[in-house]
Every structure is written in structure tokens, then in C-alpha cells.
Amino acid sequence: MNLVVYLIQLFLAALLHLSAVKAAHIPKEGGKSKNDVIPFMDVYKKSACKTRELLVDIIQEYPDEIEHTYIPSCVVLMRCAGCCNDEALECVPTETRNVTMEVLRVKQRVSQHNFQLSFTEHTKCECRPKAEVKAKKENHCEPCSERRKRLYVQDPLTCKCSCKFTQMQCKSRQLELNERTCRCEKPR
């Protein structure tokens, strides 16, 4: 009896997966022949940064769940995708929401049952500077000293270098701060 229920659930899951694949397919508009040229504005609008239905692998969202198999193995989620007008920008979510979906969770030869998983869906998208571009702009200062980096702190806005140790820290050890070398030294 359990095998029959499992086979029915497997069939329904496969059917759901196939319908999701069909829904994710972008159909040709108006029965155009394969030699028609798609106008620029159509191409531009379809490629813009926006939320779209995407198939997302469950294991991608839950990488630590390797001892289980999920049916279906992927789900349809609204996610940000598309192109930005500048290569330094990327399409990223600005608003999200959680959605809970019921899937079949199978542990090989042990158990199977319906299981609820929570996923993040994107509701709004924007083109924003890529993370590596931000990092390059933020770190525009030359290092204080190649040989003694650990002795200095640097103001990221002004790039001004100052000693990591303070006069008070040096005095607490009966030493004086040498501001040229940024080291605590014995008084002369």
C-alpha cells in the first residue's frame, strides 16, 4: 500500500515539475516565423532587471539537507534577474518575502512525508553597484607602511596613517611612543 502511495506521489510530483517547466518557457509571440527580427524595444524590455519566475533547486537553497531527496527537486520562485545598463551594476532584490511550500521529503529506505520548506521570493529589484566595485572604491588608500602594517591604523576617508599604540598605552608599560616608528620604546 505504501508503495502505491509513493508511486502516485512521484507521478504527481513529476507532473508538477513538467507544468513548472512549461510555465517558465517564454513562448514566441504571435506565431512569428524563425526568421523574423525581434524589435530592439521588445528585446530591451524583456531583458530588463525585474522579478521573474525562475526554477530554483531546493538543494541550492538548503545545501545542508543532503541526506534527504525532495520531490519536486526544484520550485518556481519569483527572483530578480535581468540586465543593467552598466557593467558595474547588477540586478539585486530590494524587497523580499518568505513563502512556504509543501514538498515530499524522502529519506532513502527510511521514510517519506510531506514537508514544509520556507523560501525567499523577491518582490522588487533594482540595478545597484556590484559588490567588488564597491570594495575597490572603498579601499582607495595606499598602505601606510609595507614593512610595519600592524603598527598603523588608517582613516579610510582621509587615508591618514596614525600609530596604533597611544602614548597612554606605552606609558602604562613604562615606555614612550616613538611617533616616527609607531613603536613603544624605552625612554632616553
UniProtKB/Swiss-Prot annotation:
Gene Ontology terms: biological process: angioblast cell migration from lateral mesoderm to midline; angiogenesis; artery morphogenesis; blood vessel development; blood vessel endothelial cell proliferation involved in sprouting angiogenesis; branching involved in blood vessel morphogenesis; cardioblast migration to the midline involved in heart rudiment formation; central nervous system vasculogenesis
Disruption phenotype: Morpholino knockdowns show a complete loss of intersegmental vessels throughout the tail at 28 hpf.
Keyword Transmembrane helix belongs to the record: no
Disulfide bonds: 49-91, 80-125, 84-127
Tissues expressing this chain: Predominantly expressed in regions associated with active vascularization. From 15-16 hours post-fertilization (hpf), expressed in the anterior forebrain, the mesoderm underlying and lateral to the anterior hindbrain, the mesoderm underlying and lateral to the posterior hindbrain, and in the ventral medial portions of the somites. By 30-36 hpf, expression in the somites is decreased, while strong expression is observed in the region of the developing glomeruli and in the anterior portion of the pronephric ducts, the pharyngeal arches, and the brain.
Keyword list, A-Z: Angiogenesis, Developmental protein, Differentiation, Disulfide bond, Glycoprotein, Growth factor, Mitogen, Secreted, Signal
Record: glycosylation sites: 98
One Pfam family per UniProt: PDGF
Keyword Ubl conjugation: no
Gene3D superfamilies found in the cross-reference section: Cystine-knot cytokines, Vascular endothelial growth factor, heparin-binding domain
Top-rank taxon: Eukaryota
Chief place where the protein resides: secreted
The protein's assembly and partners: Homodimer; disulfide-linked. Isoform VEGF165 binds kdr and kdrl.
PANTHER family associated with the record: VASCULAR ENDOTHELIAL GROWTH FACTOR, VASCULAR ENDOTHELIAL GROWTH FACTOR A, LONG FORM
Name listed for the protein in its UniProt record: Vascular endothelial growth factor A-A
Organism, scientific name: Danio rerio
Gene name of the record: vegfaa
